[in-house]
């Protein structure tokens, strides 16, 4: 669930995990036709909790294959942010990061695993070669100049600052990053 913040004027496409099995029981999976909406390059990011919260169902092969097709054939710059916090509760869990590593940021919180509800301690993982760095490198000159001002206190070669390092700097309000 993504909060709707008026500060950010995003168009949000909600894709419900609404499939049912033959007995009419909820499977917590997405319809392939809904995943296929992400083929449209107007969609820039996919935020997903996998396994789902609260039932801890991981994406099935059909959903993963549909996402792989979307990224491979239609929307190669789709940014995927996956919250894998419930992965330890699913035997044989496989993250989207394993299937779409260059497009995926994996978020993992320690609070669920250690039963420390309320803690705000987490890690992120990002492939060394990723769409985020590639998209920054391909920004127009004007936007790169804006970013150079923002991150200029970090490096003489601002253009070489990786996305993950920018995230760390932003989490510390850039100037306090040390």
Predicted features by range, described:
Residues 11-14, 104-106:
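Conserved beta-strand scaffold positions in the cores of enzyme catalytic domains, especially
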Residues 65-132:
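Conserved, well-structured beta-alpha core segment at the onset of a catalytic domain
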Residues 2-4, 63, 118:
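Internal, well-ordered alpha-helical segments in soluble enzyme and binding-protein domains
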Residues 1, 35, 108-111:
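Catalytic micro-motifs at enzyme active sites that drive phosphoryl/nucleotidyl and oxygen chemistry
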Residues 103-178:
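Conserved core segment of the aminotransferase class I/II
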Residues 18-91:
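Active-site phosphate-binding strand-loop segment of PLP-dependent enzymes
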Residues 5-8, 35-39, 78, 96-100:
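Alpha-helix C-terminal capping segments
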């Amino acid at each position: 669930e993504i909060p709707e913040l008026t500060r950010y004027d995003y168009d949000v496409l909600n894709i419900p995990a609404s499939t049912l099995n033959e007995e009419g029981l909820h499977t917590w999976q997405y319809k392939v036709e809904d995943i296929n909406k992400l083929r449209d390059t107007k969609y820039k990011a996919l935020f997903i909790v996998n396994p789902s919260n609260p039932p801890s169902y991981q994406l099935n092969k059909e959903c993963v294959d549909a996402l792989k097709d979307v990224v491979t054939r239609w929307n190669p710059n789709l940014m995927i942010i996956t919250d894998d916090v419930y992965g330890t509760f699913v035997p044989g869990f496989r993250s989207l990061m394993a299937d779409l590593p260059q497009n995926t940021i994996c978020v993992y919180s320690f609070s669920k695993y250690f039963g420390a509800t309320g803690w705000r301690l987490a890690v992120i993982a990002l492939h060394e070669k990723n769409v985020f760095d590639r998209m920054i490198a391909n920004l127009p000159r004007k936007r790169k100049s804006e970013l150079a001002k923002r991150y200029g206190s970090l490096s003489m070669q601002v253009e070489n600052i990786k996305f993950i390092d920018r995230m760390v700097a932003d989490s510390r309000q850039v100037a306090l990053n040390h």
